[in-house]
Every structure is written in structure tokens, then in C-alpha cells.
Amino acid sequence: MKRAYNFNAGPSALPLPVLERAQKELLNFQNTGMSVMELSHRSKEYEAVHHAAKERLKRLLNVPDGYDILFLQGGASLQFSMVPMNLLTEGKIGCYVLTGAWSEKALKEAQKIGLTTVVASSKEANYTYIPPLDDVQWPKNAAYVHITSNNTIFGTQWKEFPNTPVDLVADMSSDILSRPFDVSQFALIYAGAQKNLGPSGVTVVILRNDLLERIPDGLPTMLDYRTHQKSNSLYNTPPTFAIYMLSLVLEWVEEQGGVAAMEERNQQKAAVLYEAIDESGGFYKPHAEKGSRSLMNVTFTLPNEELTKTFLAEAKERGFVGLGGHRSVGGCRASIYNAVPLEACEALASFMNEFRRRFA
């Protein structure tokens, strides 16, 4: 069976060995006579899956002592509310850096819950770059500063994470596991799984344990981080199959050489596509400024709408899937998360070059 070149923004490509392993184990997981989907979440077989996923993630990201890993539901979108509900206590201010649509949504939810301020933004430039935080005047009563590490729609990414005098919170949904970083720099990290971690259905939260002490009482039980930390993310039935798939993806990342090896591959993949853009003589125009370019989402436009439609139609015929840009940017977007192989990027670059020669 011929597999598509999958450049979808999320849900997105999964490693083929992971899919094949899941297929093999689907009907009879570890000789239980049941699928993972049929196991009780209180069974010792599922408990081992749950524990393995947590430990693998801890190893891969070098999560230090004093932090905990939670497996939640509701996607990163629910974290837009949970973060301020738990951390934005009375009289404190939530600081937000606006770098795209997802950070805007995070801010919008926080505004419903408490006091907020925008400390930096690149909205005026249609989010073509990551704004520096060097000259920020931090409020004395700042609770945290929230950033979005990678912006899928606009194709920008923080190259270095900021050292901030207040607790740093990050939505890493679209680039977690794509490069090494220091977890201890953050108070809380969250990530929906469906880009670099596995299929949709589970959300990873990594939080510093001392944050639990500042959570106000009276929150709805399921929206209180303490509920899930105390119960090892088993307070209610977790998304067991999604966590099983997460564990398989993490095992695959370890087999590839870990997060540093992923970064090297991702740099190679992105370089192939950005080279096709930069050497096109302006036929393909990048959305992001060079210093802020994402290794995960390569965004570009063609000279006009008609050519864009032709490009996307021909790309689809060649087996390239998911290349349409978001309506707020237009043009095209290639999402090249960890599971997208270098060969797919090389094939796309080759098609881009051929298309340019015909239509430039």
C-alpha cells in the first residue's frame, strides 16, 4: 500500500512502525485476549502502559525532580482555561505574549477568569516574527507569563526560550519532542498530543509541584490540577488508547536516538524546504522572518490565488496531503513534525522546484 506524503497540521503523521505495532497488537494485547481499548484502566496491564508512557516522557525530556507529568483530556484548548483557573489567583496578573492565533485564544480565555496584560506582540506584522522580551516592564504582581513555543498557522517558533523573572508557562503542542530544552526553565508546559506525541485524545501537562500550593480551593474537581496529580491521572477513566499510542511514539523517539536526534532530522527537513523557497527568486514567498522560522510548519505563498489552487491540486495528485495554508495567512503550509520523513520533504521540494520552472 502506498502511503500519502502527510503534511497535515494536526492530527498529523504518525511513525509507520508505531502504526504497524498498534495494528499487530490491536486484537490481542500482551496475550490478554483483549485490545488495549478493552482493558480496564485499573488493570495491571494498563497500569504498566500508563507508567511506561510517563517514564519515557520523563527520560526523553530530562524532567527534573520536583515536577510531575499529567495525562489529561480536553486538548490544549482546555488548558487555555485551566492555567488561569489554577494559577491566576486574585490580585495577580497573567502576562501573555501574542505570537499567533493560539496565543490569542489562550489570552481570551484568561480574560474571562482574571486580570491579564499583553507584554509583547507581533500582531501588527501579522505574526511574522517572535517579539523580544528584553524591554518588558513586568508587573510586580505577575502570576506567570504565557508563550506559545511554535505557531502552526504563521510558521514561527521561539529559537531560544526567554529567561523571565516570573513563572514561564508554555503551550508546546506543536513542537514538544522536536528539540532539546531545559524543563526547569518552565513552571508549566502543556501539549495536545496530535502533532508530535501521538493521536488526538490526550493532553500532556508537565508542572512544577510547588504550583499546587497556590491553587485556589473551590475549583470544579476535574479542572483542578491537584485532582489529577494526586490520582496519577486516573481520577476518571483516562484516554487509554491514546496514552498507549503516546507510549509507542515515545519508544520510537528513543529508538531514533532521542530528542537531540529528532532536532537534527528536523533541521535537515526544514532546510530542504526553506532552500526551495529561498532559491525560487521570489516565486515562493515565506511568511515568517528568517530569524523566527519554524522547524515544524513551513508557510509560504505563491504569486496569486490561481497559481495556489493549481499548486495544491497538482500536489494532491502527486500524493501530497494537507498543504493548504490557514485562511488567515493563505498560501501553503507544510507541517513537518517528527514523524514526517526526510524523503517526504525532499519529494515536496522537488515538486516545488518543478512547479516553479513551469509557471514562473
From Swiss-Prot:
Keyword Transferase applies: yes
Residues the record lists as N6-(pyridoxal phosphate)lysine modifications: K195
Compartments reported by the entry: Cytoplasm
Cofactor(s) required, per the database record: pyridoxal 5'-phosphate
Keyword field contains Transferase: yes
Coiled-coil regions listed in the entry: none
Chief place of localization: cytoplasm
Subunit structure: Homodimer.
Biological role: Catalyzes the reversible conversion of 3-phosphohydroxypyruvate to phosphoserine and of 3-hydroxy-2-oxo-4-phosphonooxybutanoate to phosphohydroxythreonine.
Similarity comment: family membership: Belongs to the class-V pyridoxal-phosphate-dependent aminotransferase family. SerC subfamily.
PANTHER family named among the record's database cross-references: PHOSPHOSERINE AMINOTRANSFERASE
Name this polypeptide is given: Phosphoserine aminotransferase
Species in which this protein is naturally found: Geobacillus kaustophilus (strain HTA426)
Lineage, top ranks: Bacteria, Bacillati, Bacillota, Bacilli, Bacillales
Gene field: serC
